[in-house]
Amino acid sequence: MNFSSIFSQLKDPHRLIFICAALLCLTPFMSSPMALVLGFTLASLGWVPKDWNIAALTKKLLSYSIIGLGFGINLTAAIEASSHNLGLIIGSIIFTLILGFIVTRALKFDPITGHLIASGTAICGGSAIAAVAPAVNAKADQTATALACVFVLNSVALFLFPALGHLLNMSQYDFGVWSAIAIHDTSSVVGAASAYGDEALKTATTIKLARALWIIPIALVSALIFGGDKRKLNLPYFIGFYCLAIAIAHWLPQFQPLYNTLFMVSKHTLVLCLFLIGAGITVQKMRASGPKPLLLGVILWMAIGVTSLAYILYFQ
């Protein structure tokens, strides 16, 4: 793209407002919930550039941001947090998938769409849906419905969870565990956790990505159950690089100032990610999902949210 085409694009006031809003999200003045609302507002007004692939940009930026967060994670603490909560991670996944099957049958809802919503709730939202969809031969509308449902609930979680955490006077660690278990997408997990505090963010990111590793066995089992193609699995590569970033920071501690900078920059780019996610949500998309998938999503979300919270507060 040459300079003349860039300047011609900036003559469009809506495009210029969108770019300025995106840049504002990289400043300390913009919080994660504010960024999401700002993106949603611009999308509702029709001010999102239609020739930009927002979804692809969000996916790449989110991956790079999560890798950057890895440089701020202590390896020993990460192993301890993941191993200490392994039972909760596995139990929550199995519980959500079984409950999803039961509720889908009770609602007489499409089994493939129901399984996608349950997988997204059980593991890591849109990434899990994207990985499981080809494994179960899901159609485009089934995948879109599941994604729309998860995105709506993610948006609510970004505001609801920090408020509930403060209301319940949860510690940074406990809130990090709870958000990692009960919020769908990694982006909303880190958004809610970063709003609560840095320690909550580090705990939540570590446990969420440990949970995300279960995409692989769940996608394989889903392919066997639904007769899909195991060769079409779409697995998020950034998890491995996130683990590598943690290892590098542990093995080469002499570069700690650089790691601190990467961690802080990644926190700001995550806010930008939430702005872009908001820019991809419209009222039309929310209405298109209909009542049944949203009802299923809410039931599963409330079940995993309440049970995991009770476990963390009273049994951990």
Curated annotation (Swiss-Prot):
The lineage of its organism: Bacteria, Pseudomonadati, Pseudomonadota, Gammaproteobacteria, Alteromonadales. Belongs to the UPF0324 family. Pfam families: Cons_hypoth698 (PF03601). This is UPF0324 membrane protein SO_4708. It is a multi-pass membrane protein. It comes from the Bacteria. InterPro entries: UPF0324_pro (IPR018383). Keywords: Cell membrane, Membrane, Transmembrane, Transmembrane helix. It is found in: Cell membrane. GO terms for cellular component: plasma membrane. The chain crosses the membrane at residues 61-80, 85-107, 114-136, 146-168, 175-197, 207-226, 233-252, 262-281, 293-315.
